[in-house]
């Protein structure tokens, strides 16, 4: 396929995936010297159609806020890192809820965890389902009762639509007990360039670990 045909095809896909307001804004920004700059617009299209994934490795799970802040990811300038840290913060929810909430509050930045948010998290862990957190670390599966490999590794991914809204992101964590990645919402604070946690949406039910599965 020639370069010109490729650009036109990409632009066609872009148009199909946008509403009219966003399309008009993109075309306006792509005008150069009174002519439509196809290279710029095609570049945006290609970027939009790509997905991305990052992995983060931790030697140990932080026991408290001080330990969390000591991690390089705690600069919070990378939304993928903030998403990964949200999982680490939940790692203490069973044994030290106060420390877990303190870490979550740090990740939420200008906001704090509301009583309703904390209740929702508690509900997700009902009946001892704290294995949900472990399931997101590499190597954890129902067959090994969600025992993570060491060191702890977390994969965070995006879709072509994860950053559609300016200063907002929906990223995804991958559980060994689910066929589909689970979302987490984040928001950027432009004045600091940091990405903060907005909503944890990845704690839905997953496959039962073998030790608790009466049908295993």
What are these model-predicted stretches?
Residues 9:
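Cationic, low-complexity basic patches in intrinsically disordered or flexible, solvent-exposed regions
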Residues 13-14:
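Short, positively charged and aromatic/hydrophobic N-terminal segments
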Residues 17, 88-95, 174-178:
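Short, flexible beta-strand-to-coil junctions
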Residues 118-177:
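Surface-exposed, charged secondary-structure patches
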Residues 179-215:
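Short beta-strand edge/turn micro-motifs at domain boundaries
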């Amino acid at each position: 396929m020639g370069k010109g045909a490729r650009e036109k095809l990409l632009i066609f896909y872009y148009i199909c995936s946008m509403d009219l307001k966003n399309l008009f804004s993109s075309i306006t920004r792509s005008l150069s010297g009174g002519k439509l700059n196809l290279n710029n617009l095609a570049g945006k299209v290609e970027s939009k159609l790509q997905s991305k994934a990052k992995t983060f490795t931790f030697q140990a799970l932080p026991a408290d806020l001080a330990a969390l802040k000591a991690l390089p990811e705690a600069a919070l300038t990378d939304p993928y890192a903030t998403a990964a840290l949200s999982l680490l913060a939940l790692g203490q929810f069973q044994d030290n809820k106060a420390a877990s909430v303190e870490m979550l509050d740090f990740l939420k930045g200008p906001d704090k965890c509301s009583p309703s948010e904390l209740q929702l998290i508690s509900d997700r862990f009902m009946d001892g389902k704290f294995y949900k957190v472990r399931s997101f670390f590499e190597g954890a599966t129902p067959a090994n009762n969600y025992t993570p490999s060491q060191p702890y590794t977390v994969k965070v991914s995006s879709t072509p639509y994860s950053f559609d809204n300016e200063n907002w992101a929906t990223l995804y964590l991958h559980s060994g007990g689910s066929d589909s990645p689970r979302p987490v919402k984040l928001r950027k604070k432009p004045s600091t360039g940091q990405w903060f946690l907005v909503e944890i949406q990845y704690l839905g039910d997953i496959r039962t670990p073998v030790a608790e599965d009466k049908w295993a």
